[in-house]
A protein has these predicted regions:
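Short hydrophobic beta-strand element within catalytic cores of glycosyltransferases
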Residues: 247, 263-274
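Donor-nucleotide binding loops and adjacent catalytic segments primarily
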Residues: 18-21, 32, 36-45, 164-244, ...
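Active-site-proximal region of nucleotide-activated glycan assembly enzymes
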Residues: 100-159, 286
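C-terminal alpha-helical cap of glycosyltransferases
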Residues: 310-326
Length: 326
């Protein structure tokens, strides 16, 4: 499994690894990632999974390390199933695998998984050398290599936080791409919100560590410090207990949130190269699965116990495992 660059690529890869290790020997599973993926390694449930961490900050040494470390793996294993989950790191590794197939008569199978409505730059290249491309969103005209499996997320039986439901609970999550503009949106809403209701509202705010001090001061200038919880990463989110969520529309976030609740306003990360978050959002707006405007509610707004999203299948991971292990 290869993934890097962002949580949107890495988290589906880790979900796949955790499920695969339940039916296959984890000693035979290798996860290749970069320094961003290294932050998520604690989510791997088996301690026996092999890992290669490649530092991608210096591109020359990055490519050199890929060639040296990955070539050794291909030389000592002539029949490997590879799955690229996105990020620049996947392309050179999958290309090397293909070259081994051509020139050294290896029997490697190459697959890719695309989390977004449109292919990212790496997967646009990877598609041409892949045996199959597993896609997350349904579409009318599927290409010959494409197989719809949906998106999938981490273990749904994880420990989750317990919120004080005497408060109106608000969550802001910006993903690994950052949440600065979302925080500015939230600050603007708080500044214009009725101060009486603010006392009954609790905010759970994701802030990049590099901006924590500055943004924390902006929040505490507006409201009592006891009404805030600040975090950079939070693994125990109980999404269905929030009265409103302000979130990026990255593929991982959008699917997991909508599985639990539709009390969400998605805001795309517009500086992304291909605007994939905008296309993700457009898909769900078309299906009336995102609020049209962001506002802080003045009363409890929890989803109905009968809430069900027919487009989100948390068990789609079983389908991709069937295809890649048969």
């Amino acid at each position: 499994m290869i993934a890097g660059s962002s949580g949107g690529h890495i988290l589906p890869a880790l979900a796949y690894i955790n499920n695969l290790s339940l039916i296959s020997d984890p000693n035979n599973i290798l996860f290749i990632t970069n320094e961003i993926g290294e932050k998520y390694l604690e989510k791997i449930e088996s301690k026996k999974i092999n890992k290669i961490i490649l530092n991608s900050k210096n591109k020359f040494f990055f490519i050199l390390n890929i060639f040296l470390k990955v070539s050794f793996v291909f030389l000592t294993n002539r029949k490997i199933n590879l799955i690229g989950f996105g990020g620049f790191i996947t392309t050179p590794i999958l290309i090397i695998s293909k070259l081994f197939n051509i020139f050294l008569l290896s029997f490697n199978k190459i697959y890719i998984h695309e989390q977004n409505v449109i292919y990212g730059l790496a997967n646009q290249i990877n598609y041409f050398i892949a045996k199959n491309a597993f896609i997350s969103f349904p579409k009318e005209n599927m290409r010959s290599k494409e197989i719809l499996v949906g998106n999938f997320f981490m273990n749904n039986n994880k420990l989750i936080e317990k919120l004080d439901n005497t408060f109106i609970n608000i969550l802001l999550m910006g993903g690994s791409a950052g949440s600065l503009d979302l925080n500015n949106m939230m600050l603007k809403e708080i500044a214009n919100f009725n101060k009486v209701y603010l006392k009954k509202t609790k905010f759970f705010i994701q802030i990049p560590e590099s901006h924590l001090k500055i943004l924390k001061k902006k929040y505490t200038d507006l409201i009592d410090n006891n009404n805030f919880v600040f975090f950079s990463f939070k693994y125990d989110l109980n999404l269905k207990e929030y009265d409103i969520i302000l979130s990026r529309s990255g593929s991982g976030s959008i699917n997991e949130i909508l599985y639990y609740t539709n009390n969400v306003y998605f805001s795309p990360h517009l500086i992304s190269r291909d605007q994939h978050q905008k296309f993700n959002l457009d898909y769900f707006l078309y299906h009336n699965m995102s609020q049209k405007n962001f506002f802080i509610p003045n009363k409890k707004n929890l989803p109905s116990q009968f809430y069900f999203n027919p487009l989100i299948n948390p068990h789609s991971i079983n389908k991709i495992i069937c295809y890649t292990t048969r």
